[in-house]
């Protein structure tokens, strides 16, 4: 594996002009001062890894550029990473049951949106926890989530940044609620709650766009009630759509990158792993793969389910 410095030097370090304030390349003098102060206090505290501009600015944005709060968040994250063996997760964790799990809870990446973000799709409405928990456990599902976040950071984003010719820091998420039932939603709530906790606390500011499609009647109205209590920047990233969502998705995702099942033109053969397992994107294209190498997979194509 390349050093952290070698990897950072291999892809663009600035976001596109006009990107969110507080992102690399879009800083005020106050932002720059907070960035340098945070880096200084973390170095003084003995931290040596993940002190690059992009990482520290994500923690600062998550805490409204309050240096003390961002420092506490960063330190908690590093403690969590050590306790969970995150730095060696690619060597230590193998999710051989994923091809089977995907049938009952489809979660996958597929190409990029118009801003170069990896597109992440989760079909929550298709979840079948009863069958899934015959194959795996919630603990292993959450471990796989961490594995995917690390792959996103170490492999998907560098390759996506090279393709976009600017720093890409976030994902474009599609959450498909088609067929969701109250009972299914209640079943998966525990996992979703834990997954959200991991994302918010340890991988902050990774959401670029978030589309909920096939949202049940009344979902949008309920969201409008909560909007006043949410951060305006977060609200601007979230789109609640019913069954007529294709036009809105195609504004953000090129037709050739959007799967056919969602109104696009991208089709994947079963020989390639199908939509759920093919993991197609710039992270699979030699043109955009750098010193980090091609993104690994946590499973083989002919799996034997691994016990917990």
UniProtKB/Swiss-Prot annotation:
Quote the PROSITE patterns the UniProt record gives: CRAL_TRIO
Instruction: Please report the stretch or stretches of sequence annotated as the CRAL-TRIO domain.
Output: 97-270
What the entry lists under SUPFAM superfamilies is as follows: CRAL/TRIO domain, CRAL/TRIO N-terminal domain
Q: Which GO terms describe its molecular function?
A: phosphatidylcholine transporter activity; phosphatidylinositol transfer activity
Instruction: Extract the InterPro entries matched here.
Output: CRAL-TRIO_dom, CRAL-TRIO_dom_sf, CRAL/TRIO_N_dom, CRAL/TRIO_N_dom_sf, PI/PC_transfer
Sorted alphabetically, the keyword list is: Golgi apparatus, Membrane, Protein transport, Transport
SMART domains cross-referenced by the UniProt entry: CRAL_TRIO_N, SEC14
Please give an example of a GO cellular component term from this record.
Answer: cytosol
Which residue spans adopt a coiled-coil conformation according to this UniProt entry? none
Q: Can you tell which superkingdom this protein's organism belongs to?
A: Eukaryota
GO biological process terms, semicolon-separated: ascospore formation; Golgi to plasma membrane protein transport; Golgi to vacuole transport; Golgi vesicle budding; negative regulation of phosphatidylcholine biosynthetic process; negative regulation of phosphatidylglycerol biosynthetic process; phosphatidylinositol metabolic process; post-Golgi vesicle-mediated transport
Subcellular locations according to the entry: Golgi apparatus membrane
Major localisation: Golgi
Q: Which Pfam families match?
A: CRAL_TRIO (PF00650), CRAL_TRIO_N (PF03765)
What is the annotated role of this protein in its UniProt record? Answer: Required for transport of secretory proteins from the Golgi complex. Catalyzes the transfer of phosphatidylinositol and phosphatidylcholine between membranes in vitro.
Mind telling me what this protein is named? SEC14 cytosolic factor
């Amino acid at each position: 594996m390349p050093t952290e410095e070698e990897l950072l030097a291999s892809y663009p370090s600035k976001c596109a002009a006009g990107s969110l304030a507080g992102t690399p390349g879009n800083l005020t003098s106050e932002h720059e001062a907070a960035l340098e102060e945070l880096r200084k206090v973390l170095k003084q505290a003995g931290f040596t890894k993940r002190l690059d501009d992009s990482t520290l600015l994500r923690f600062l944005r998550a805490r409204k550029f309050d240096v003390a709060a961002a420092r506490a968040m960063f330190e908690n994250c590093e403690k969590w990473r050590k306790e969970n063996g995150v730095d060696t997760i690619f060597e230590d964790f193998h999710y051989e049951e994923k091809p089977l799990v995907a049938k009952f809870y489809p979660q996958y990446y597929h190409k990029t949106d118009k801003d170069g973000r990896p597109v992440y799709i989760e079909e929550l409405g298709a979840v079948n926890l009863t069958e899934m928990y015959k194959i795996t456990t919630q603990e292993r599902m959450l471990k796989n989530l961490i594995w995917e976040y690390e792959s996103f950071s170490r492999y998907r984003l560098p390759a996506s940044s090279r393709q976009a010719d600017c720093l890409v820091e976030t994902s474009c998420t599609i959450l498909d609620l088609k067929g969701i039932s109250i009972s299914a939603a209640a079943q998966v709530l525990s996992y979703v709650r834990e997954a959200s906790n991991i994302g918010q606390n340890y991988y902050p500011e990774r959401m670029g766009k978030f589309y909920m499609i096939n949202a049940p009647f009344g979902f949008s109205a309920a969201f409008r009630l909560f909007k006043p209590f949410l951060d305006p920047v977060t609200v601007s990233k979230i789109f609640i759509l019913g069954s007529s969502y294709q036009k809105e998705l195609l504004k953000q995702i090129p037709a050739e990158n959007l799967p056919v099942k969602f109104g696009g033109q991208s089709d994947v053969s079963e020989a390639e792993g199908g939509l759920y397992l093919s993991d197609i994107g710039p992270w699979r294209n030699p043109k955009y793969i750098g010193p980090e190498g091609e993104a690994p997979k946590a499973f083989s194509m002919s799996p034997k389910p691994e016990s917990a």
